[in-house]
Amino acid sequence: MMKKIDVKILDPRIGKDFPLPTYATPGSAGLDLRACLDSAVELAPGETQLLPTGLAIHIADTDLAAVILPRSGLGHKHGVVLGNLVGLIDSDYQGQLMVSVWNRGQKSFTIEPGERIAQMVFVPVVQAEFNLVEEFDSSERGAGGFGHSGRH
């Protein structure tokens, strides 16, 4: 299913020097987001930085949201992940998409202008209304928490 999302280009290099986000393959769930930097940024071990993407989106549809996720290669090969682990973009947000990057690795890592730093996935949203109860109907699991359902 393809859904149209309004996007505003905030950095004139997007569409010229840096491509617009696209799906890499027909089966891709995420669109790559790029660092819209004027110069390279060095991330020391343990350091976080907030990087602009040069894009703003307005999802508008309250049945959708977007999540910003790490790119697997950056995390696995270089220890660079998202500083907030997952970014949530609500349907009514209209500001620039920013990416918090965190170097959890042991070596400094340099992020170049236009480098792919995260991916964005659109997800369905269900808003819940709470129904206050004194007790729950019993279930097989009950209140068993972490590790309760077994190891295998």
UniProtKB/Swiss-Prot annotation:
Binding-site residues, substrate: 71-73, 84, 88-90, 98
GO MF terms held by the record: dUTP diphosphatase activity; magnesium ion binding
NCBIfam families in the record: dut, PRK00601.1
Protein name (record): Deoxyuridine 5'-triphosphate nucleotidohydrolase
Pathway in which the depicted protein is active: Pyrimidine metabolism; dUMP biosynthesis; dUMP from dCTP (dUTP route): step 2/2
Organism: Serratia proteamaculans (strain 568)
Originating gene: dut
Alphabetic keyword roster: Hydrolase, Magnesium, Metal-binding, Nucleotide metabolism
Required cofactor names: Mg(2+)
Top-level taxon in the UniProt lineage: Bacteria
Similarity field: Belongs to the dUTPase family.
One of the GO BP terms on file: dUMP biosynthetic process
Pfam family membership, one: dUTPase
Function: This enzyme is involved in nucleotide metabolism: it produces dUMP, the immediate precursor of thymidine nucleotides and it decreases the intracellular concentration of dUTP so that uracil cannot be incorporated into DNA.
EC number: 3.6.1.23
InterPro entries hit by this protein: dUTPase, dUTPase-like, dUTPase-like_sf, dUTPase_trimeric
